[in-house]
Amino acid sequence: MALHMRMIVFLCLSLPIWAATGDYRKQPDGIVLQTAEGTLRVQVVADNIIRVTFAKSAILFSRNASAVLPYTPAVKWSLTDAGGEIAMTTARLRVRVVRNTGCVSFLDSAGRPILAESPGGHVVESAEVQGEQTFHARQLWQANADESLYGLGQQQKGTLDIKGYDLDMWQHNTNVVVPLLVSSRGYGIFWDNMSYSRFGDLRPFQPIPAENLSGLTMAPMDGSTPPATVSAVEVGRAPGGGRGGARPKDSRWEGSILAPVTGDYQFKTYSNGAIKVWLDGRLVIDHYRQGWLTDEDQVKVQLAANQRYAIKVEWTAEGGNTLRLTWKTPSAETGKFSLWSEVADGVDYYFVYGPKLDNVVADYRLLTGQAPMMPLWAFGLWQSRQKYDTAQQSLDVVGEFRKRKIPFDNIVQDWQYWKPDAWGTHQFDASRFPDPDGWIKAIHNLHAHLMISVWGKFYPGSDNFDAMQNAGYLYQPNLQEKMKDWIGFPYTFYDAFSLGARQMFWSQIDKALFQRGIDAWWMDATEPDLTPSPPTLEGQRTHMPQTAMGTGSRVMNGYALYNSEAVYDGQRSAAPNHRVFILTRSGFAGTQRYASATWSGDITSTWTAMAKQIPAGLGFSISGMPYWTQDIGGYTMQQKFSTRTPKPEDEEEWRELNARWFEFGVFTPLLRVHGELRVREMWALGGDSHPAYQAELKFDRLRYRMLPYIYTLAGEATHHAGTIMRPLVMDFAADKSARELTDEYMFGPAFLVAPITAYKARSRSVYLPKSEGWYDFWTGKAVAPGTRVDAAAPYDAIPVYVKAGSIVPFGPELQYTGEKPADPLTLYVYAGANGAFTLYEDQGATYDYEKGAFSQIPIQWAEASGTLTVGKRQGGFPEMPKERTIHVVLCSKDKPTGFRFEAAPAKSAHYVGEAVVLQLR
C-alpha cells in the first residue's frame, strides 16, 4: 500500500515559449493558456473536479511532493471558444477562462455562478527561501457575501467560520494544517502545497499605534503599585524565548482604542498564562496556555470609524512570562479571500463541487486517499496518562476497569518506558518493565489492547541513532548546535521524507515493539518537534534545512503524512491482515489513508479550552479528516488543580470539568482520556458515589451501547467517505443560524450534540435547525425545528437531540467491544419523517472487508404507514451473527420515549437475514 509520490510535471511542450498572450492549446484533459503573466493550465479531473495551475515559466512546472494520489482523468468534456473567453463544460460544471488574463470562474451546469477568481488573482513572485530560488504563490478569489468558509485543519481560536480571519498555516503543537477550504455554497478548494501557508490578508499583525491607543495604564492586580502609563500591552520576551526567567506579576491594562476606519478588526494575543480581553465591557478573548507552550488567540470585532472603545486586559502569569497584544485594521481586500504559500513552483489548486458538502469531502478523499477501517476496539474507551511509570502500574489500571465492570478497551503507554538517556532505542527499561512480553500478554488476557508512544526522535549513542546517522537519515542542525530537549539530552529527528529512512524507522520499531504484540501506535510530536517549546516558524525552518524531497521550507507541513506512511506501510507489509491504528499529534492532507487519527495536542485543563475543542474538531473534520480526538480533561492543568492540596471548591470544579469533558467526548469519533500530573481514571474523581464518577460511568456505558451506530459511521467513512463529527453546515447549509454555531454539531446523521462548557451550568441554550423535527434524547419530548430552547443539563447529562426520521441501533451491555455480537439489537425509531439507516458490520480486526467480507442490513421507516422494514441482509462474513433478536422502540410526538438502558420495546422480531416488516402504529 506504499504511496510513492509521483512527480507532477507540467510540461507545456505543445506551447512554444514565444506563444502570444491569449494563445492556448487544447489537451486531452484541458487547456494550456499563455497569459501576459505566465502559463495557465486548467485540467478536468472529474466532472466536478477542476485542477488549476499557474506558473511563470511556459516550459516547466514540476513537483515531487504532493498529497494527491496519481489519477488518470477520463471525463467527457467540451470546449467552446467565444473569442475573448474559453468555456469548458462537463456534465456538472461550466468553467470559463478569460483569454487575455487567465481569470477562471466556475458555474454549475445551469450556468449559476459558484466561485470566481479575482482579476489578477494568480500572484507568483520570485523568492529565495533557505537558499532555494523559488516562488511565493498566492491565489485570490471573489468572496460571496452570503457564504461561510470552513476547514484548513484544526485551529485553536474558537472559530469555525474562518471567513474574514487571517490564519498562519504551519504545523505546531495544538494546530494542524489540512489545506482544504470548504464553502457553505457547496464547493471546496484543495490547495496542494506543503510549505508554510497563509489564509487571508498578508499584512502582519502590528502593535496598536500610539495615536490609536489612549490613556493606557498598567498596574499589578494585587494593587502593590499604582497604575503606570504605558504604550503597549506586552510582557516578557519575544516568541521563541524558551523556558525560565523571572515571573512577572499578574497585571491589568486599561485604556481606550480609536478605530481609524469602519470594518472588521482582528486582535491577536501571543501569551502564556491566563489572559482576558474586554472591548467596551464585552469579553472577546479568554485564553489560557501553559508556561512552556506560548501560543496565539485571535478574535474578529467590527468597529466604527472615529469611535473610541474601552479596552481592558487582565493577565495572570501562572508560570507564564509572555504577553503581546497586536491588531490588524480592516483589509483593503474586502470581498476577497486568498491562499498563499511560501515555497511553490506556482499556483496549484483543485476546485471541487458538491454541491452537498459530503460530496466535497468524498472528492477530497478521492484525490488524497480513502480512510481504511479502524479496528472495532478503537471505538471503545482509551485510558491514558502522562505516564504509567511501570508495567505493573498500567496493568493494575486495566485490572481495576475489569474489577469495576467499567466498559474499557485500550490502555496507553506514554513516553519514557525506555531508560532516561535512551530515546529512540524503543527498548524497555528493565527496572520498570522487566517482562515486556508478559506484560503485553497479560493486557491481552484481560481483553484489552495496548497503544504505545513512539517518536521519530533520537538521542546520540544508540545503535538506532548510529544506523540512522550513518545512512544520512537524521536532521543535522540540532546535532551541530548540540541542542538539548527539556530533559537535558541532545536530540534530533529522522527525515521521514526519505523512503530509506522510513523503512529503517519501521524496521526498528517492528523489531522492538510490533513483534512483541503492540496493537496501536501513538506517533507523538510529528510536526516534528525540532526545537524546545514554544515552537516557532523560524525554528522549524532552520532545524529542518534539507530533506529527501527538498528544503524543509518546501515540505515542512507534510512530515506527519510521511511518518504515518512509514508505520502504515511497514505494518501492512509485516502483518497484511492486521488493522493499523495510528494516533498522531500533527496531520496533513492524506494522513487519513494511513489509518491515522489526530488528537488536538497539549491543550489545557480549562473550560475555555474544552469549548474550543468543539470548533477545533469540527474544523478538522470538515477538512476531510474522519478521525479526531482530544485529551479529555485537558493535558496541562491550571495551578489551582495541580497543587498538592487543592481547595475543596477547586477540587469540585476539577471533577466536574472532567465529567463534562467526558460527556462531550462520548459523542466524538474516538473516546480518549489523557493528561499529565493527576491520575485521570474515572474512579479518582471523588469515589464511586461522586456525581462525576457516576456521570462518566453512565456515558461510558452509553458509548458501548451505541457501538452499532458508531461502527456503522466508521463503515461510512471508509466505504462512502463519510464524516462522523459534523459541523451543522453539512446538514443544514440553508439555515444561516445553524451554520454560524460553534458549540453544537451532528454526531452522524441522527444526533445533535450541545456540550456543556461552563462550570455549574445545569442548562444551556440550544438551537435546533430547520428540519422535519427533533426529539430530546433523554426524555423523548418533541421539539419544534428552527427554534432555540433552554435545554436541561443535569450533572449526568448534556443536551442531545435526535432528528425526526432517525433510526438509531443500540447493542447490548458490554465490558469490551469484542465481548459479544450486537444481539439483541435495539432500534430506536424517531417518527415524524421517513427514515433509513443501513447497519454495517464486519469482522472488526482484519482487512477482509477489502475483499468484500462485510454485511449491510438496510432499515427503513415509512412515516405514512407506520411500518419499519428490516431488509434482507446484503453480503456477509464468517463471524457475523447468522440470527439475532431485534427490539424496536418508537418515539413519536404522542408517545415520547427517552433513551433507557433497559427499554421496553414496542415490537420484537427474530431476524435471520431475511426481510422483516414491523407495524409500529
Regions found by a protein language model. Name each.
Residues T262, N306-R308, E883:
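Extracellular Ig-like/FN3 beta-sandwich strand-entry sites
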Residues I257-V277, I311:
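Aromatic-lined ligand-binding clefts that engage carbohydrates, nucleic acids, or primary amines
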Residues A19-P209, R243, D264, G281, ...:
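N-terminal accessory segment at the very beginning of proteins
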Residues Y270-N272, E314-T316, R873:
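Beta-strand-rich extracellular modules
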